[in-house]
Amino acid sequence: MHSDELLVEILVEELPAQALLNEYKEMPKKLHALFNKRALEVGKIEIFYTPRRLCLLVKDFPLLTQETKEEFFGPPVKIACNHQDKTQGLNELGLGFYQKLGLKDHQHFQTAFKNNNEVLYHAKIHAKEPTKDLIMPIVLEFLEGLNFGKSMRWGNVEKSFIRPIHNICVLFNGENFNDIEVKEYGFKTKQATKAHRQEGFDFIQVDSPKAYFEVLEKNHVILDPKKRKAKILQEIKELETKHRIIVEIDRDLLDEVVAITEYPSALLGEFDKAFLKLPNEIIITSMKENQRYFAAFNQKSQESPTLHNGFIVVSNAISKDKQKIIAGNQKVLKARLSDAVFFYENDLKKPLDNAPLESVVFVQGLGTLKDKMEREAIIAQYLTQKYASSLNMPLEKALELVGRAVRIAKADLLSEVVYEFSELQGIMGYYYALKQNENELVALSVKEQYLPASENAPLPSSVFSAIVALSLKLDSLFSLFSVGKIPSGSKDPFALRRLSFGLLKIVVHYGLEFDLKADLKNLFEKVGVYQSFDLEVLEKFLLERFNNLIDCNPSIIRSVLNTNERGIVKIIQKVKALKRFLDDPKNAQKKELLFSAFKRLANINKDRNPNESSEFFISLFKESQEHALFEAFNAIKTSTFESLDSKIEAYFGLHAPLEEYFKSVLVMDKDIEIQKNRKNFLWGVYQSFLEIGDIKEIAI
């Protein structure tokens, strides 16, 4: 037998769920790296976790290391020997090389060639060694390499970790790993594990991976998080069927309860129906954030199920008295929801107009929330006038309602409910607005101002809401860029990348053309209070988001962005049209020929000043191919196309006259006047192509 199964359990105090979940994804990669570092070829690696333990299971862990050769290259022979022919032995430099390696016999030194130089050389062969001596150092290095964000020290231990470590159990090939002193964390190892807390606190001896799994199973520990998740979902499904409810499975919450349980049980509790007068979002958020409960809905109405006065709690207890567990959770939730009622009713007493926005700083150097609201109002007015035809209401009415929406949009940030649950910003503003008899469009736009919340999240439901959402996003971009709060690398504290992506998605979804040069400049000047900064930096930042906006060959996107087109909607339309054309198999030959011809066209003009005159004269054309290309080109220039697709088809149709032109016409004619005329003509053709895209950028 050359290998065996290796199991390592790190027994700890309860690990914080979110930190564990974040780092768990990186653990297999980090363990692999440690094995590779020592040239250990192993089989499948599995890492399991519960709140109290990390378990590393490695299949086919070798019993012996591989024989390895370590090479050492010294100074060049010509300066390390007493004579260049090497017959006179080593000088002081050469002797020093071997002495550093701990070698005394230099009589028969070796040489090798490195970078075309003959140098002193020594190879050290490392014989195979038992891997059992490597296991603990690997485990300790693994623990030290984990990044949970925060760590702590306990007792007089040398190292810190996210929570105190109580034991490391190593099971491998029947070897003895008991009583190994781990000074770093202040304990001696035991080949033992512990049961579920309610089963006892004593160590249970184990002597093999098989015995380890059997002990945990008998003692109410489900080690595999996938199995714990499956158990929870199965029990929730049974409760849904039994009680005719629909449980909203929040995937993040599910992962969290899996991470805080060793033997989960899903139980159904209830709360007083009187609490259902609260907005659903308050109840659901309170249950999720404070208690990690899942919300339940009535099954009667499939289209729009109503919130049920029940909740799912996932318990880690193994008590048979489930009702006692349920009663305890119901008592806690009652207190939480009573607080929520108090906050909500207090908020309803405060008019939205009276919210003291001037008392809250937006960002240092950018004024208060009132200042932000006033800037957004100017932007919203500009956008309302720009998109008036898409609003289905008179402009005067639209300006009034949009202005009102922006005026009250930030009021809920000062409410007691949002102070308690910040993720309800906008949502609570919607409910408060309706309760205070605001227009429904206004109220809904307050709710939707922060949308989309993520890449695939819903967008604002109307152009009206879109204008309010765009105003918020544009002001945040202008403001933060003006004071240098520009994302760099992985740092994006104000989530401006997500915000920008949302801006683009809204504009494209509703076809609200927005020019990243002209409109940005107009708004910057119209608001008039932003600190001066280079608007091209913001323009470039927004353009960089296009690669995530559409599933497409990035070079096609780049070809359109490399032109003067800065209308967001037009950019996307051109990218999609080019993609359709290039993806069509019947255009394969045509595009290959045009790419070849266009690259020649681009090369001829690569050093040209864009502002240089491109005037040319047909009277100076000497070859029939010049006239043929001009006629084909002129036909396109003077045509009106029904669609971008037909325009692209026409431009790509120039591949034939372009190919003939380059076969028969010498652009760099000896006659300077003719040469200049030809270059000017081709420059005009090249510039015209930029109406659809810079074809030289496309890589298919």
UniProtKB/Swiss-Prot annotation:
Transmembrane segments: none annotated. Its main location: cytoplasm. It catalyses: tRNA(Gly) + glycine + ATP = glycyl-tRNA(Gly) + AMP + diphosphate. It is found in: Cytoplasm. This is Glycine--tRNA ligase beta subunit. Pfam families: tRNA_synt_2f. The lineage of its organism: Bacteria, Pseudomonadati, Campylobacterota, Epsilonproteobacteria, Campylobacterales. Belongs to the class-II aminoacyl-tRNA synthetase family. It comes from Helicobacter pylori (strain Shi470). GO terms for cellular component: cytosol.
